[in-house]
Every structure is written in structure tokens, then in C-alpha cells.
Amino acid sequence: MQRPAIIAERAPNLDPAVLAAMQSQPSGVTASDDWTAAMDRIMALTARSPDAFRQQPQANRFSAILEAVVPSRTNPTHEKVLTIVNALLDSKAIRKDEAGLIYNALLERVARYNSTNVQANLDRMGTDVKEALAQRERFHRDGNLGSLVALNAFLSTQPANVPRGQEDYTNFISALRLMVTEVPQSEVYQSGPDYFFQTSRQGLQTVNLTQAFKNLQGLWGVRAPVGDRSTLSSLLTPNSRLLLLLIAPFTNTNSLSRDSYLGHLVTLYREAIGQAQVDEQTYQEITSVSRALGQEDTGSLEATLNFLLTNRRQQVPPQYTLNAEEERILRYVQQSVSLYLMREGATPSAALDMTARNMEPSFYASNRAFINRLMDYLHRAAAMNGEYFTNAILNPHWLPPPGFYTGEFDLPEGNDGFLWDDVTDSLFSPAVIGHHGKKEAGDEGPLLDSRASSPFPSLTSLPASVNSGRTTRPRLTGESEYLNDPILFPVRDKNFPNNGIESLVDKMSRWKTYAQERREWEERQPRPVRPPRQRWQRRKKGAHAGDEGSDDSADDSSVLDLGGSGNPFAHLRPQGCIGSLY
């Protein structure tokens, strides 16, 4: 343990690297030794006889021979560590009695964190993991491949075409292929004349595919009324029901026709098993936190958590479409209701009732669910927004919105006919308010323009108290009648359920101030007509002006009047008094 310190005392002036090389000289066989001498030392392991080497254990003999033929690789790690220790001694960073401890500690740390054995073990472990994953993948692929081969062999025994519901039959087989391919821990195998599908993902479940398809053979494309579906459900065996339940997650709304019995049953299974599951760990954590905060009402807490965890999950909205039969029913209802509305002048509700009354009983019974939902939606649309109802009936390409399928009817709001429905946010913008608040006389023109463009009908005749201090032009004859002509105003839809509010609004719009009544009374009074001036009065006035010389120029009317007496050039006479020249 104290070897580095002892050697360092004997050769204090040597370089640390040279000193480390001297300290690390091996005492055994080296590459520079003679091969014959090395073999002699190996064979002469015992002093009694060279033949005694053969009597050594096999492991010892083999180890000695291997070491002599292929020497071990030299590891310079201890030499480098020894060089570092010698350098620390020369720089007096450590004492001589601490050299052995530092040397051992450095060797242990190198062996633990920077050993080639550790790196080799890590590489070997990574290789083993990769090999295990590759074997698992090959096993999984081979298992699915065998299941697909068995499934194809089973499908080859089934007919390619069915009398009814060919599209549903084809989509069902595609969903079966997808389930066999994607579901782990499942396989398809043959046992005797029958083929089986077995899965152990959530408990061991086995389905006899041969018997299930034999039971479903006569049910493809069958459309059963709502009341008779219980009778039809007795034809399904538990084996067939289990197959439908397993395939349901691999279908969508367009895979199987919804109006068929099998499509209806698969839809129920898919919606039943597709509900979001509550995370129990999250539920327990939130419950413990709420109890720590002092909220002991677990009933309201459970309701809140169930709502947050199950009803507020972001999902891709499903695509809903009508099948061919439902679209034909929709077009028939549109044509029938439009005929009752246009020809007989019936109300929307009466037109819908007459259309439903004239349907054939068997036709209505086979499509009762869809017809009831369609009539309910159209009745709501007619009651809430007549324009939307009219557009839906008269549009030959109209299709119901997604809320029609989910039952959440979101209809656009109609125009109730209130005065405040015409008010826009631009009227109360800060720019318009500041524009109206100015008091300069130069703002009269823009103010009149804003009044003319105001959406309020009553703003055209403001009280005189508001316009006090401003000069207004006199109104022309018949201007008020022209501006108040009802033909110029748009026809406003009356809101029949709110006739009281409408009458109050009409009464308030007819109220007028005393200034308005006074101005209207003055406009209705007949104005006196001024008599026309006689020609002889104008001539007399022009002659009098020419004689007195008080006017610089004659009247325009006298100048233009070329007939009669008088001096037509009176305006050319010089001003002032002129005396006699002689």
C-alpha cells in the first residue's frame, strides 16, 4: 500500500512519468523474455520432475498455456494513476502518508465509472434488449400473419354476395379484418370444421365465426320497425351478439346503414362502450385535496368531477349524413309542405300536420323515428324563425345541420321586428359621439348628414329645444308629407306575441312637442299671395328716378322694358351738378 511513497523517497528528482514506469514493472513473463526460457519455466512448475506439468489440473495447465501463447493485454490505467499521485506528491498537494490512500481511491473510482468491463456490459445489455424486441416483433408479426391466413381461409368459405345489404356485408368483413390485424393478444384458428376468433386482451373471449356468420346470413339489410325490433332480436344468438360487440369499436356511422337492424344494434354497442372512463387515480387525488381544504360534501364533488372528467373532453366532431332512404323522405316532405303553403295558403304548422296525416301507415311505421325527428325539427324552425323554415322547405338541396342528428337543435334567431334590432354598434362609436358633441357652427353640415343616415325614424324630427341656437332653413311646401310617406319606409314585421310593446312603441313615436306642433300648424296655414306689380308703376318709378338723379342706374326691369317713354340711358349720365359753360 505504501509502495508509491517509498519509491518516491528513493528517487525524488525523477520525472513522475518515469517514476511511474519504474514502479509498474511486472515481475512475471514479458514479451521481451526468451520464448524457450518462458516454456522452461512453464514446464518446470515443480522442482522434482518436468513431467509433473502433466499431472497439474486441466484448468491450471490450460491457463498457463494460454497466457504463454497469447499474453494478456497491458492496461496502462494504473500507470496513469500512479503518475498523477507522484505529481501530487511533487506539488505537495498531498502528504507522503496519504499517497497510498489516494492511489487506491482513484483506482476504485476508475474501475467503477470508467471501466471497459462496465462499458462492455452496457453494450451487451443493449444488444440483448434489441434482440429481445426483434424476437417479440417477429413473433407478433408471425402470429398476426397466421391469423390473417386463417381468416382468409374462413372468408373463402363464405359467399361473396348476399341477397340484401351487400354494402353492409362488405363493410362488416372489412371491420373484421381490421379487428384481427390491430387487436393484440388475439388470433384466428381452425378447430374441426369451424373457425374461431379468440382474444385475451380483457379476459378470455372466444367467438365461433362459422356459427356467427351462419346466424347473420339472413339478417343483412333487414329493416325492422321500432316496435318490431324485439321480435327480430330473438333471432340473434349470444355468439353473434358477442361478435357484434367486439366489432363495434372498429366501425363508424357510415359503415353500416343506421336504418337496418344490425346497423342500429352496432351503433348502440359502439355508443355504449365508447363512453369515456373516469381516471380513478385522478379522482382520488382531487377528492383528497378537496377534503384537505375543508369541503366534505362528496356528493356535489362527485357530480362536479364526473362532469369535468367525462363531458369536457375534446373530441373530433363526428360526420353525420343521411342515407338514400332518409334523403328521399326529406325531399318528399319538402315538396308536400311547399305545395300546401303555395297553393292552399296554409300555415307552416298546418302544412306539416297535413303532410304527416297523408303519409301511408306502413311507410310511416318503417321510418317512424326519422319522420318524428324531422317533423319536430321543422315545427321548431317554423315557430322560432319563419324565414329559416321557408328557406329549408324551398331549397331542393337543403340538408339538416349536425344538431338534427344529436337532438341539440340550434336554430338561428329570427327578426322580432323591434326598433332596437336596427341599431348597430357603429352608431355609438367614440368617433360618432365626439362628432355629435362639437359646438362649432361649421359642424352643422356633418350633423345634418348624420341625422339623415341615422337608423332611428324619430331622429329626423328632433325637438326644437335641441336645435336651439342654430339656424335652420325654411321647409318647402309638401316636404314633410314626402319625408313621412309610408311607402319610403321598409315594412316592419309585427311581433304578434308582443303586440302590447308594439302598440306602446307606436304611441310613443306619435308624441310631439309643442314646438313641433306649432311648426306644423304654421306650415298648414295659407300664405298671402303678393299681387303682381303693374307696368305703369314701374315706368313711373323709372321716370321719377331719371328726373331727380338720385339713382345711379335705372331699374333692371325698366332697362329690359324697351316699350314706352323715358330715358333708357339715364344710367350713363354724369354724377354731380354741372354749371353753364358760358
From Swiss-Prot:
Is Phosphoprotein found in the keyword set?
yes
**Subunit info?**
Interacts with hexon proteins; this interaction tethers the peripentonal hexons to hexons situated in the facet. Interacts with the penton protein (via N-terminus). Interacts with packaging protein 3; this interaction is required to promote correct genome packaging.
Phosphoserine PTM positions: S233, S458, S465, S503
Keyword Phosphoprotein carried by entry: yes
Q: Where in the cell is it found?
A: Virion; Host nucleus
Post-translational note: Cleaved near the C-terminus by the viral protease during virion maturation to form the mature protein.
Please give the residue ranges the record annotates as the region Binding to hexon-linking protein. Answer: 146-259
Question: Pfam families of this UniProt entry?
Answer: Hex_IIIa
Keywords for this protein: Capsid decoration protein, Capsid protein, Host nucleus, Late protein, Phosphoprotein, Viral genome packaging, Viral release from host cell, Virion
Comment field (misc): All late proteins expressed from the major late promoter are produced by alternative splicing and alternative polyadenylation of the same gene giving rise to non-overlapping ORFs. A leader sequence is present in the N-terminus of all these mRNAs and is recognized by the viral shutoff protein to provide expression although conventional translation via ribosome scanning from the cap has been shut off in the host cell.
Q: Compositional bias of type Basic and acidic residues: which residue ranges?
A: 517-526
Residue ranges for the region (Peripentonal hexon-tethering domain) are: 1-114
Name by which UniProt lists this protein:
Pre-hexon-linking protein IIIa
Where does the record place the region Disordered? 437-479, 517-582
Residue ranges annotated as propeptide in the record: 566-582
- Positions carrying Phosphothreonine are T282
Q: Which residues carry this modification: Phosphotyrosine?
A: Y482
Residue spans of biased composition, Polar residues class: 451-471
Q: What does this protein do?
A: Structural component of the virion that acts as a cement protein on the capsid exterior which mediates the interactions between the hexons, including the peripentonal hexons, and reaches all the way to the penton vertices. Two hexon linking proteins IIIa, one from each facet, stabilize the unique edge interface between a pair of facets. As the virus enters the host cell, hexon linking proteins IIIa are shed concomitant with virion acidification in the endosome.
Which InterPro entries does the UniProt entry name for this protein?
Hex_IIIa (IPR003479), Hex_IIIa_N (IPR043053)
| Description of what induces expression | Expressed in the late phase of the viral replicative cycle.
Q: Where is this site: Cleavage?
A: S565, G566
